[in-house]
Amino acid sequence: MSRSLLVISRQAPWSGPSAREALDVVLAGGAFDLPIGLLFLDDGVFQLAAAQDAKAVQQKDLTANLQALSLFGIDDVFACSHSLAERGLTAPDSAQPLSSAQISQMIDRYDQVMTL
């Protein structure tokens, strides 16, 4: 049986390669039917914001990767409700908002945790 993996994405989408790398890891795991989850935390919640203009910052758009999560069978997508509120954002339907206490409990369910 495969060990479960939670990937925590803490970086804004255009602040460096970490956001893309987190999505790449999750999508690769999903392609191999691994039990995998994704948590957006801190500035990582900016990846969930609608209407981002990647061309304005000369970056590749991550929206398609986010939309592909469900196609790869990745249903465990979470967002820190405190991080969302601090940044004036709301979670899209594709991400379940969790409190700090819920995040702690959820992390305990995974065998391995990777933070990017």
Located regions from the model:
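An anion/phosphate-binding loop that grips the pyrophosphate of nucleotide cofactors and donors
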Residues: 110
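Short internal beta-strands
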Residues: 36-42, 76-81
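A glycine-rich helix N-cap at a beta->alpha junction
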Residues: 55-83
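Short, glycine-rich nucleotide/cofactor-binding loops
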Residues: 6-20, 52-53
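N-terminal beta-loop-helix "entrance" segment that forms/cooperates
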Residues: 44-58
